[in-house]
Structure formats: C-alpha cells, structure tokens
Amino acid sequence: MSLQEMFRFPMGLLLGSVLLVASAPATLEPPGCSNKEQQVTVSHTYKIDVPKSALVQVDADPQPLSDDGASLLALGEAREEQNIIFRHNIRLQTPQKDCELAGSVQDLLARVKKLEEEMVEMKEQCSAQRCCQGVTDLSRHCSGHGTFSLETCSCHCEEGREGPACERLACPGACSGHGRCVDGRCLCHEPYVGADCGYPACPENCSGHGECVRGVCQCHEDFMSEDCSEKRCPGDCSGHGFCDTGECYCEEGFTGLDCAQVVTPQGLQLLKNTEDSLLVSWEPSSQVDHYLLSYYPLGKELSGKQIQVPKEQHSYEILGLLPGTKYIVTLRNVKNEVSSSPQHLLATTDLAVLGTAWVTDETENSLDVEWENPSTEVDYYKLRYGPMTGQEVAEVTVPKSSDPKSRYDITGLHPGTEYKITVVPMRGELEGKPILLNGRTEIDSPTNVVTDRVTEDTATVSWDPVQAVIDKYVVRYTSADGDTKEMAVHKDESSTVLTGLKPGEAYKVYVWAERGNQGSKKADTNALTEIDSPANLVTDRVTENTATISWDPVQATIDKYVVRYTSADDQETREVLVGKEQSSTVLTGLRPGVEYTVHVWAQKGDRESKKADTNAPTDIDSPKNLVTDRVTENMATVSWDPVQAAIDKYVVRYTSAGGETREVPVGKEQSSTVLTGLRPGMEYMVHVWAQKGDQESKKADTKAQTDIDSPQNLVTDRVTENMATVSWDPVRATIDRYVVRYTSAKDGETREVPVGKEQSSTVLTGLRPGVEYTVHVWAQKGAQESKKADTKAQTDIDSPQNLVTDWVTENTATVSWDPVQATIDRYVVHYTSANGETREVPVGKEQSSTVLTGLRPGMEYTVHVWAQKGNQESKKADTKAQTEIDGPKNLVTDWVTENMATVSWDPVQATIDKYMVRYTSADGETREVPVGKEHSSTVLTGLRPGMEYMVHVWAQKGAQESKKADTKAQTELDPPRNLRPSAVTQSGGILTWTPPSAQIHGYILTYQFPDGTVKEMQLGREDQRFALQGLEQGATYPVSLVAFKGGRRSRNVSTTLSTVGARFPHPSDCSQVQQNSNAASGLYTIYLHGDASRPLQVYCDMETDGGGWIVFQRRNTGQLDFFKRWRSYVEGFGDPMKEFWLGLDKLHNLTTGTPARYEVRVDLQTANESAYAIYDFFQVASSKERYKLTVGKYRGTAGDALTYHNGWKFTTFDRDNDIALSNCALTHHGGWWYKNCHLANPNGRYGETKHSEGVNWEPWKGHEFSIPYVELKIRPHGYSREPVLGRKKRTLRGRLRTF
C-alpha cells in the first residue's frame, strides 16, 4: 500500500465517522431513552513522525492543539515540521439509562476502534524505523508500473519496465549485449542490427547481389565474397585459388585460368648410374602433395613402372635395372589428386662388373683369394696387394679360369698384417671396374705360459709376447667342474691375475692374442688354489651363559672346522671341533655380561684356512625380588635385588591403568627408587631392567596402588546473611562421595552433610548473620577417607531497613532508618549528587538518623546507608533527597564557526521546565530559542560570518525565571569552497575555488612536495584559481587554502593534486605510451618487449580510432624515394615526423615473441575522401623466412587488398621473392610483400598514374590512381581507449595531411 493510499483510507473512514455522528440525534434514540441526559465527548489525536528525508509534504496543522478533551501531543511537538496529525472529536449524548447495547452505538464504537487500529498501523509503517531506513522515493509509487515492497524496500516492476522505480522501458533481450537501451529501443553497436541487436549486419548489404540471412550474405549464382561484391571466377578457381573481379589467383602449386592444372616439375636430371640402378633428382616444390615417378626401357612402354615419392624427397634411386640399357624416366607433380604434365629424362645403365671376391684361407704368412668370373668376356686379371699402412704394392697377373671362379694364393706375407687387395678384369689393355677387398694374415700365439702366486681365489699367469701387431690378449680359465671365465689383457702386458677363483680348485688356463676379430692359436697351463676361510662369522641367540655362532661354509673340500673362544679378561679359553657339514655351534659355560672373542677356521689334513673372528657378549641378568612399598597419593617406592653383571644403569618404567607411561633411569649402585607424579587412587604396573650400553636385561615387574587424594582449593563464596557456598577442586581418584562439616565459632554448633561424588560445591544453609564458621571437606570410598580440607565462612551483616528522607532545605536533609540486628561497629552514610559529587560520613552504631550538610541547591541526591563491622559491610539501603533551585552559571561560548556557535553553562540545580537563549548581533538583529531542561548547551545557528553577538541564557519554571547569564560570540571567517584540481598533467594542474561570503583581505595557498618540502603562496582576494607548475610526474601533492582578514584566518579547505604517472615504466608499444597519459601524437621511445635495454623511437598516433598506434609507414609528400635496396627496407629509412619506413627487422621484433596480438590499420586519403582498412592480425616473420607477411580478418571502408599478399615474402629490386616471371619490385618501383604482383602498393612511385606503378590500393582507387596520403600503423588487437587528460604535444596531423 502506498503512502498516499495509507493516508486516503483513514481519512475516508474519519469522514464517514463524522457524518455518522452528525446524524446521531435522529437515529440513536431507542424507545425509553431521553435526550436530556449528560453529554460525553470522545477526542482522539494521532501524530505520525515522518522522516525529513521522505518526499512527503506536510502542511501546518490548521486546528488548535487545545480541545475540550485532553491533548495527546507533548509540548513542542506542534512546532515540528514533519509531523502529520490526525484529530477527530465525537460528541455523544449519553442518556441516564444504560444504552450501551444500542446497535447504532455498538456499530459506531466498532468503526472508531477500526479507525484507531488503521492509524496505529499507518504510524508503525511510516515510522523512521519502518520506512526503509530513509528511502526517499516512496512517493514515486514505482512510477505507476510496479509494486513497492516494504519488506524488501524495492519495486517489483511490470513486464517491459525496469529501473529502481520502474521508470524506464525495458529493451527486448537486453539488446543481446550488443547495444544500449534508450526509452525501450535498442541502439545497436556496430556491426549489430535488429530490434534486439541479435545478429550482425551483412557487409555492404550484400552489394545488391545476394540476400542477408542473420548477418551472412547468401550470394546470387554469379557473385561471391562476404559482401557478394566480387564476380565469380571460372569453376570457382577449382577450389585452388581465390577470385578477384572474375579472375583466378591460384594457390601455389596450381596454374591455369581456373587453377585446375598442377605446375609441371622442373630440373629433372641424372645424378648417378650403375649397371642396375639410376639415381635421379629434381627441383623441390613445397606446394605438392607428392611426386609420381615412372620409368621403362626405351621402346617398351608397356613394361613401365610407377613410384609415389613423398613431397619432402627430391631425389630417387631406381633399382633392379638391366645393365647397359636405355631407360625413359618421367616425373609428375601431384596436388589434391591432380597430376601435372610430365617432365622426361633419357638415361643408360653401366656394363656388368666382377662378382664377389673373398679370402678363402689365411695363415700367418699367406692369403688365398678367390672371385667370381663376370658374364662378359675377360682375357685375364691383374691382382695388386700391399699392407694397408704402407705404400708398397705388388702386382701379379692371374689368368682367367675356365671354372666359374678364379683364385690366387699370395705368399711371403707378415703375420697379423692387414692387406689391401685389388682384382682388375682386363680385356686387352682396357681395364674394367676393379673389385676391392681386404685380407689379414693370422697372428702368432703366445709362448712359455706359466702360473705362480696362487691364493684362495687368485692366480698370476705370464707368457712371452707375440711378434704380430695386436689389440689385446685373451685369457680363459676353466675349473675342474667346467666353470669358465674369460678376460682381456692389454697388448703391452705379458701377465695377468686371475680373480674370482674357487678355493682348493684346479683350473685349466688358455692364453691367445687378438686383433679385431682375428685371434692366434691358444697356449695353455694349470693352476691350483688354496683353501678359503669361513666367512660372515656372526653371534646370535645370546643368553646369560650361552651363545650361538654361525658362519658361511667354505667352498673348498675340507675335513672339519675348529672353534676357539676366549673371555675378555683372558681367564679362560676353550677349543671345540665342528663337523665339516656344520656352519654353526653353541658356546656353553659362559659367564653373564662378559664379552668373548671367537675364532673359527677350516682344516684339511695338515692344511688350514685363515682364521675368522667375532665377539660374543653374554646377556645381563635381570633384577630379582621386585617389590613396592611406602605408597602415598602421588608416589611409591620400588626396590629389587641387584644383578651380578657389570652394568651402566637400571631403567624403571611405570604405566597407569589408563595407559599413561613414564620411564626413569636409576644408578647402577642403587637397588630402589621413588616413583613420583602418580595419580591418586590409581593402579600402576612397574617394570625394572638393567642396561649396559645398548644391551638390556629381561624386565622384572610388580604393581603399585596409590592413596585417594583430598579435595584442593577449598574456598567460600556467595556468602549472604544466612547462607554460604563452598567449592573445591574435585579429587582425581575414584570415590563414593564427599562429606562437608561446618561448625559455628560462636557456640560450637556443628552440622555434617554428604555431597555426591560428581559435585564440587555445596550451599551451607541455616547460618546466622555476622557469625564465622569453620568448614571441613573430605572424600570417601568405602571405609577409606582422604585427608580433610578446611576453610572459614563469615556470614554477612544485615542491612538497615526503612530508610527515609525528611526536613530537606536548599543545603541540608535528614535521613533515618531502622537499626540492624547484627553486632556492628558503626553505620556509614554515603550521598551523591546528580552531577557525581560524593560525600561519606560515619554514624555511631547506637544512632538511627543523621543530618546531611553542605548540599547544593536544586540538586537531587542519592543516599546510601549500610552497617560495618571490621572490614565487613552490610548491603546498602538507599533513598533520594531533592534541594531547591538556582540559576545558570559559567556561561561560555565555544566551538565557534563562520555561521554557528555553541554556548554552554553549568546546569541549575533546581528542577526547571526549560532554558531560554537570546542572541543579538552587533547590528541589532535578535533571535530567541528555547532549550530543553536536560541540556546545558545549545548551538546558535543562522549566524553571519565575522559578526559579534551578545548571548543571554536563563532558566524558567512556569512563570518563574532565573537571573540571566551573558557572554559574547564572535563568528569565524567562512573558508573558500569547492577547491578542486583540474587540467592535471604530468607536471602540473589548475586549482579553482569559490570565494567565501565574508569580507576578506586575501588567501594563503599551501602545497607540500613528496620530499616533505612545503611551499606557501599569498594570493589576492579577487583570485579564484591558481596554476601549479614544475611538479614531479606521478606524485601526490596535498594542497590547502585559507582566507584571511588581518590576523584572522578561515578554516583550511584541502584537496590533493596527483600528477599523471607512468603506468608502464618501459612501454612496449604506443598503447602503453598512451596509458601513461600521453594524449598527443608524436615521437616517443618504446622498449621492445618491455626490455629497458632495447629502446626504439617510434611515431605514435594517439588520435585515430582511440589512438595507441605505432606508425610504421607514411607517404604524404613524395619527397622521399621508396625505391630502395633490401638492406634499406630491413633497417628502415626516412624521418618518422615526415615520410618514412620503420624497417622489417623492427616490425619482426615488434610483432613476434610477445604475448600481444597486433592488428594493422591502413589509412588512405585524397583531397576530398578518406578510407581505412583494418586486419585483426598482423605479423612479420624473421629474415630467415624473408620477412613473410601474415594478416588476419579484414574490416573497413577501403576494401580488402592485403589478404592477397598474406603469406608472401618481402621483395625489393635486388632481392626477388615473388612468384611473378619478372621482379615485381623492379616493375612496380617499390618494396612490398609482392605475389604476382599486387593489389596494394603503398611503397610505389609517388604520384605515378601508370598501371600498378603508383601508390595503389586497388579495391579503393584501382591500379591507375596514386593515393597522395597513406599511413600504416599497428597496435594490440582489441585495444580501445577513451580520450585521456595529459600534456598536449604539438601534432603533425594537419601538416602531414596537407597534399
């Protein structure tokens, strides 16, 4: 329900009530009722306090506050500006007879009651606590298009409306996130259209050659492209090119008008031929899928074969051919399963050569060579041989054998030498192709092999070295049971040690020499090893008088083992024999805690192995007769018989029934110890054992049961006149109950009460006031009792009763009371004024009244009386005493501002109705205001700055007034207002302000530098602005401003001026330069990839399309020749403030190796027109890739010319990287990413109108118009920037675009 509706309903009800009452004399008289009875008036007045923040207009109450009935409004409320007051008066003629049951009266009373309920409800809803914490828009009623909820303090809008007050029309689909909603209509962002901006617009409206379907052009049959502006090409370029104005531009690898043909391969040639193979190669092409190679003997096309060759391969060896035969070889390029025209090659294989040759037999000084005779005619052979390392070559003539093979035995050779052998077939004097092979004579074998220095597992063998050159010797040795090992020995050595031999074993040893895979004959000898000794001798299962020792059995064949053990003190030695099959034995008769040295060795006949040894310390014996005695609540003594062995200490461990464990060491001389820290009433398990080093004896054990503990920290608290509470810390032991006994000190009366075991406090009752009691508490379990804890309990004294005040004057009052029952020392009377002044006086114990003196007039006092005995006090009885009235004192003025002042005074002591304050200006203007009696200060408002006022204050009660107190108040100068910085740059800013209303002499402006330095400026009274200059970049300056007049100053007004700082200390591009608050176009230093060591000066365009562009090319005057060499285009040339080219290397570094994705913009202008093209991706590759260009998707007004150049390398007149037959840079007078040749030629000859030679952008002005202004620029993709404030720099824009 709205506020107006809430007001409307009760008002209607009230009007109905008034009309009903007006007609009452004619309708309210039932039979038997007289009209001459008493008149009764019912008066109701309601006040609703509406917050001043609510938009509800309240008019003054036209009715007087007084009426025949009592008013429900307090004094002063009628003057409040935001009170809504409803009043109705109902006069009823009440007859003498009981007419309460009359129907009309009943109905009227019911309607009046309903009216009251509605008014109460409205008051609650419109209170400051219910009206949504000061919501000020309730009167809008949600603009009539929704429902306001008091529960949520918000509007619930109708469909199609939105806003906090449903004040706006809603747009369909919230404009799909692609537009702005204005008055219920979507204003779409480019390039979106539709009622809800739901889909993008079609480019160029499909150029009239297609239909637009949800943002995509469906072109007519003869047209194509995104905007259907291009004429379709033959066969749609077969899917192997792109169409431009009806002409196909084929992809690499395709050719023809419709791009249907594959480019023919080039450079097919013969690299190598043999009697059965041909190796061919050709120029590689990266634009094919694979190659198709075919070949056949000349004149035998039907026997041809085809081979598919991968595109990465550009040579192939054809195998399995006939000797001396001519072959036709053809090669085709294949792309997308389309084959090119073939390229042909005629090649011939060689004649047959000798078959395989080999060495059939080798000795130390001869080699037998054999080879296969060829199928062709051969007259004889020449055989040449010589050492591989020497120049000496011998030659012999060998006749051709009639057998399929020929052979020759070469003699007189050196042992172990490799020879190079050549067999040449001869026919007449003509040599055929020779066959080569190598042969090596055998190596001589070692002599005088002997064995010496034999141990259990090693033996040394030696020999006389061989004469041949060798790589190494090989030694092989085999045991009697067939175990064989082999080892290599350096060629310069003539002996070696055989390891890993088995003890007591006979070995056969062989030695021979090797070179490569060649080995000499073997020489041999014999070796017999010694017996091994027992290994891994260990001691285990040791007791106090025995020990078991074990060992690994020896490998050799033996008769027995011998064991000898000796005590550490050498008092006893024993020796025992153990069978050869055993590997352990038990040593008996040992003494506890003694270490023994044990030796074990093997025997066979009179031969003995080496001795193995170990140590065997016997166990310590354990303590005996462990007992527990002298047990208390938290400790127990344990004792035992000492052990016999020599030990370091005893260890005692005791564990409670709850699992808590402690462990303590005990000196070796002791045989008892005290266990401490035990818990009362707890059973403990005790273990004791002896230790020596890491050695421990067996554990002895016993049990210990502690006593019950007594209650602790027994205290008395919450003591009254006849009762006291005692409490204690519960015992830790398990008990049945507590017992509490308390005895009076006065007559010895004693009481004893049981308390549950779960309790730790109890209340002692039946006590007498002011008596001391002795209290004992102890715990019980069965017949067992703990020790008794005791404390004292002193009951309180009873307090005085019936305290009253009488005989009050301005400065005295008499108080009296009934005396207490307890024995006391005195009474104490304590009285405190309303302002906190306190006095305290003692009164004799026989008295029951006293006079309070030194009171202040008109002051209320609180009086307390209580009894004392020693340090003990009774409860306090209290009453009030009120003295008579006086006037205000100490009137002072403080907290004076330019338009207000606070006056304060000492409040009067008397009870008053209010204070009155009157203040008069120096020119006679007077105001008088009432102040509540509770206040002792007030604020004088509506004062004028710089004015003196006379202030009077007095108290009132009814018609009575106190004397007037007076003082003076001088208002302050008002300060300047609205101090604000503006036009802030990196080095300064403008400060502006509004002057004060007071008459002043001038201003003082103060500002502080970052280093703490303060500068002060005095300005004239007419100044309203000041320019701060020479400030530091990115710094904050506190600024304050005061007005002054003579020696008086106004309040400070302050602000801060923060100069523009650099967000990016090392900006990597112009977008970051712009974000450093540089708003003007011009030369700036950027840093490649943000690296401070790689600065680069560039021209930044801060204006075009939000700015942030790095300009890398400009043509606008024609004064700079762009027909440059490769090196110039790589490094860059020209003046960035005029015409220039930034450089390919810089473009590569800017657009690669960085997370930023760059877009490129081309701006074109003539004298009367302008156009632009933007591509959402731009990248220049490295020099290795000839600075290949990559661009993304196009948008703009100039037409798409760069997509044609996408993926192509840069070309200059001295570096041709295009695919045209001629050099495009040479024929088109520039440097560019030419293909075959261009649709864009920004670096062409300035002003040239010949076809394709000028500064062209073909989609905009064609090939025969030279564009007078071109600018190429890049920035991060998607970057946008609202205009920024900053230091303006001079721009070249006007001059750069002057043709």
Swiss-Prot record:
CDD domains: ChtBD1 (cd00035), FN3 (cd00063), FReD (cd00087)
EGF-like domain location: 167-198, 199-229, 230-260
Principal subcellular localization: secreted
Tissues and organs where the protein is expressed, per its UniProt entry: Not detected in normal adult mammary tissues or brain but expressed in most breast tumors and brain tumors, such as glioblastomas, astrocytomas and oligodendrogliomas, tested. In brain tumors, detected around the endothelial cell layer of the clood vessels.
An annotated Gene Ontology molecular function: integrin binding
Disordered, as annotated region: 605-624, 960-982
Protein name: Tenascin-N
Gene that encodes the chain: TNN
